[in-house]
């Protein structure tokens, strides 16, 4: 189910009056509800969230960290997930039936996740099985719908995050000769390349044309990349890197592996949001960095490291628009709905989908 389907089915819309409240009033009310509920309320926040939201997060992290935290939390009655829809789905699947997972704004989706739906995936699988036989194991980035995770779990595969993709790909190659990697071609390509797989041994599946694009024929294909991408990270270009180095040859460039292979290759380093944060934390004072990832995180890193010269690799970059739908008014409204006993934006993955999706998620967690 795409995020558009979710919106059509949902009446969980915040009243406009919340937008008229002062920031101080909203912060006071959020803090009061957090104090009232104590450990019965848990707020995980993704690194890409706004500061006005992240200040109230009980735990911040990337997709892998938040998935692991959600799985371990047994105390909270309500988990208010400050992230996007697929993350809240994952939290729902990893927590108990007695726990309620809430997304403050149901419009907080992920364009990448919507680039692979079940009809497209079933058609692709049928055609790829015809071409390659039973030699393929599917993997999906956690930035995917619960239905896609279920498909992958049903066919023996696992989910991956940008933190653990390399480990999961290594495991997958012990299971089958070939990998189908959904839905982000860039993370799949960059990870496979790091494992020593040549670009000519990778092919791209175009779901819009229902065709496989392989430069050197089908025989040597080891990785089949779904033609999807992150709309934020695709905006970092090789021109950004050339311009940055021309302006300052001493600057170090670190990017997220959702960037294109060309950008990753030209950069000094690449890794998950956690890896980027850890790298900057450990860097010496006075070091200079250009970071290729979402702007909210970059701005937060800049603020936290006044002793270093840090900037965005793309000076015209904007934050992730869907992630930014979770703002302070929506967080407050969501918490007050819980306080009234009428939680809105409840995320509930159907049992049949959940069972197969959990196979994929648990395989990932056991590998990493």
From Swiss-Prot:
Quaternary state and interactors: Homotrimer.
Annotated Gene Ontology cellular component terms: cytosol
GO MF entry, a single one: metal ion binding
EC annotation from Swiss-Prot or TrEMBL: 2.5.1.72
InterPro entries in the record: NadA, NadA_sf, Quinolinate_synth_A_type3
Known cofactor(s): [4Fe-4S] cluster
Effect of loss of the gene: Mutant requires exogenous nicotinic acid for growth.
BP GO annotations: 'de novo' NAD biosynthetic process from L-aspartate
Protein name stated in the entry: Quinolinate synthase
Pathway: Cofactor biosynthesis; NAD(+) biosynthesis; quinolinate from iminoaspartate: step 1/1
Top-level enzyme category: transferase
Sequence positions that bind [4Fe-4S] cluster: 110, 230, 320
Effect on the protein of changing residue 230 to S: Loss of activity. Does not bind iron. Cannot complement the deletion mutant
Binding site for iminosuccinate: 46, 63, 141-143, 162, 256-258, 273
SUPFAM superfamilies tied to this protein: NadA-like (SSF142754)
Entry's cofactor comment: Binds 1 [4Fe-4S] cluster per subunit.
Matching NCBIfam families: nadA, PRK09375.2-1, PRK09375.2-4
Known outcome of mutating residue 259 to S: No change in activity and in iron content
Organism superkingdom: Bacteria
Subcellular location as annotated: Cytoplasm
Alphabetic keyword roster: 4Fe-4S, Cytoplasm, Iron, Iron-sulfur, Metal-binding, Pyridine nucleotide biosynthesis, Transferase
Function: Catalyzes the condensation of iminoaspartate with dihydroxyacetone phosphate to form quinolinate.
Family note: Belongs to the quinolinate synthase family. Type 3 subfamily.
Catalysed reactions, semicolon-separated: iminosuccinate + dihydroxyacetone phosphate = quinolinate + phosphate + 2 H2O + H(+)
């Amino acid at each position: 189910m795409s995020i558009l389907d979710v919106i059509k089915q949902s009446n969980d819309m915040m009243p406009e009056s919340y937008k008229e409240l002062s920031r101080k009033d909203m912060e006071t009310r959020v803090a009061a509800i957090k104090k009232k509920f104590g450990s019965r309320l848990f707020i995980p926040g993704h690194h890409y969230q706004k500061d006005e939201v992240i200040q109230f997060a009980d735990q911040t992290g990337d997709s892998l960290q938040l998935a692991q935290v959600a799985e371990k939390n047994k105390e909270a009655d309500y988990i208010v997930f400050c992230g996007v829809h697929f993350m809240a789905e994952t939290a729902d699947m990893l927590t108990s039936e007695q726990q309620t997972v809430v997304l403050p704004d149901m419009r907080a989706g992920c364009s990448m996740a919507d680039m692979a739906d079940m009809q497209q995936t079933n058609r692709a699988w049928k055609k790829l099985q015809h071409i390659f036989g039973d030699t393929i194991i599917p993997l999906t980035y956690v930035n995917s719908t619960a239905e896609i995770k279920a498909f992958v779990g049903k066919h023996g595969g696992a989910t991956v995050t940008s933190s653990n993709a390399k480990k999961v790909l290594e495991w997958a190659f012990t299971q089958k000769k070939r990998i189908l990697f959904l839905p982000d071609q860039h993370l799949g390509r960059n990870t496979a390349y790091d494992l020593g797989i040549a670009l000519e041994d990778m092919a791209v599946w175009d779901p819009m044309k229902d065709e496989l694009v392989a430069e050197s024929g089908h025989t040597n294909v080891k990785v089949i990349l779904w033609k999807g991408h992150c709309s934020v990270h695709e905006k970092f270009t090789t021109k950004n890197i050339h311009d940055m180095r021309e302006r300052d040859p001493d600057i170090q460039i670190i990017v997220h592996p959702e960037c294109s292979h060309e950008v990753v290759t030209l950069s000094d380093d690449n890794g998950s949001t956690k890896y980027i944060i850890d790298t900057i934390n450990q860097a010496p004072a006075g070091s200079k960095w250009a970071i290729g990832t979402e702007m909210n995180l970059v701005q937060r890193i800049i603020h936290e490291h006044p002793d270093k010269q840090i900037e965005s690799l793309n000076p015209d970059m904007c934050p992730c628009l869907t992630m930014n739908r979770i703002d302070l008014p929506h967080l407050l409204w969501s918490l007050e709905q819980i306080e009234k006993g009428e939680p809105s934006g409840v995320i509930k993955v159907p049992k049949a989908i959940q069972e197969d999706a959990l196979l994929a998620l648990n395989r990932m967690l056991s590998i990493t």
